[in-house]
Amino acid sequence: YLGGNIGIPLFTKLNEIKPEDLIVLELSSFQLMGMKVSPDISAITNITPNHLNVHKDYQEYINAKKNIYRNQKDTGILVINADNDLTRECQNDAKGDVILFSSKQKLDYGFIVENGIVKECNDGIRKHIVSQDEIKLKGIHNLENICTALALTKKLVNTEKAVDTIKEFAGVHHRLELVRTLNGVEWYNDSASTTPTRGISALKS
């Protein structure tokens, strides 16, 4: 099941969801604010100022984001961006395993983007997973998103099957969505980019 902050409420599916089912949720800071439980596997891709019209200050926003892992058990998994100062600090109070990803650093363990290629690092050994020219998504931020997805599903999905899906995935509506090509110019709908950080990532793509 897929839901959360992407317009699909799962409350309507509660009678269908079984204990063994897997649920993928995108959770915003104001959904996380009052949460007393955390998903078994969580990810924080970045922490930058956002939703400050809802939160009393930036620190409250940061604290809300951290609720996605604060109540995990020691069997939990937290995936975080090693390139963002605030997300990198989250590994210090994580209770379970931490998987890092980076597009700027070399990692002994985790996932990196190097020269347009997503690689898995294991004890310093780098394994080619998928490259920019093999996928339909544009931008280094989408390669970082692929790192996140691979880390989240590492213990659940065969990597080769995951890569097959990644190669065919064309993205979601309103996020660098190709509308049409006219007179050699590609027109994109990126109306989901509601913060400077997202807008800059889209423009760099």
Residue positions per predicted region:
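Beta-strand->loop->alpha-helix junctions that form or flank phosphate-binding loops
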Residues: 3, 95-114, 163-167, 177
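Short glycine/serine/threonine-rich phosphate/pyrophosphate-binding segments
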Residues: 8-10, 27, 195-199
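Active-site-proximal loop->helix
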Residues: 12-16
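Flexible active-site lid/hinge loop adjacent to a nucleotide/diphosphate
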Residues: 6, 17-101, 113-114, 119, ...
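Short beta-strand-centered segment that lines the nucleotide-binding/catalytic pocket of NTP-utilizing
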Residues: 1-9
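Acidic-glycine-rich active-site phosphate/pyrophosphate-binding loop
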Residues: 112-130, 172-180
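Nucleotide phosphate-binding/pyrophosphate-handling subdomain across enzymes
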Residues: 131-205
